[in-house]
Curated annotation (Swiss-Prot):
Glycans are attached at N127. It is found in: Secreted. This is Interleukin-15. Its main location: secreted. GO terms for molecular function: cytokine activity; cytokine receptor binding. It comes from the Eukaryota. Belongs to the IL-15/IL-21 family. Disulfide bonds join C83-C133, C90-C136.
């Protein structure tokens, strides 16, 4: 019975060994290439996607249900499609306020994970410059529940665009 690991790159260690032994790289450099190849075969692919971001947002929403956090956050409730990256960056900045105000380690860890995921996705799309968009401080202040609902809405805009 063969156990499959879907997140591992399909790199055969035997191929590296064969290439190493049958080539002129029988030097220290060749051994380094072989060792690095072995390590890379075991590394999981880290492809973040917006579905994971929504999952983390739902988790944050569930975690704050039992707390009373009286914070208002800059919230973009009517995002224009040409300003969605700017709005997303504002949401990510405001998310750190939730992490700080809650003082909860689960919320902190989930927020950190969400920020890393979203930033990875945004950076993989390249540097997009948007003009004519509102600054974070110009946005309306809303409670956490409305903030999270608007956040989910903007993430869905990214999902629908891809």
């Amino acid at each position: 019975m063969r156990i499959s690991k879907p997140h591992l790159r399909s790199v055969s260690i035997q191929c590296y060994l064969c290439l190493l032994l049958n080539s002129h790289f029988l030097t220290e450099a060749g051994i380094h290439v072989f060792i690095l190849g072995c390590f890379s075969a075991g590394l999981p692919k880290t492809e973040a996607n917006w579905v994971n971001v929504i999952s983390d947002l739902k988790k944050i929403e569930d975690l704050i249900q039992s707390m009373h956090i009286d914070a208002t956050l800059y919230t973009e409730s009517d995002v224009h499609p040409s300003c969605k990256v700017t709005a997303m960056k504002c949401f990510l900045l405001e998310l750190q306020v939730i992490s700080h105000e809650s003082g909860d380690t689960d919320i902190h860890d989930t927020v950190e994970n969400l920020i890393i995921l979203a930033n990875n996705i945004l950076s993989s799309n390249g540097n997009i410059t948007e003009s004519g968009c509102k600054e974070c401080e110009e946005l309306e202040e809303k409670n956490i529940k409305e903030f999270l609902q608007s956040f989910v809405h903007i993430v869905q805009m990214f999902i629908n665009a891809s």
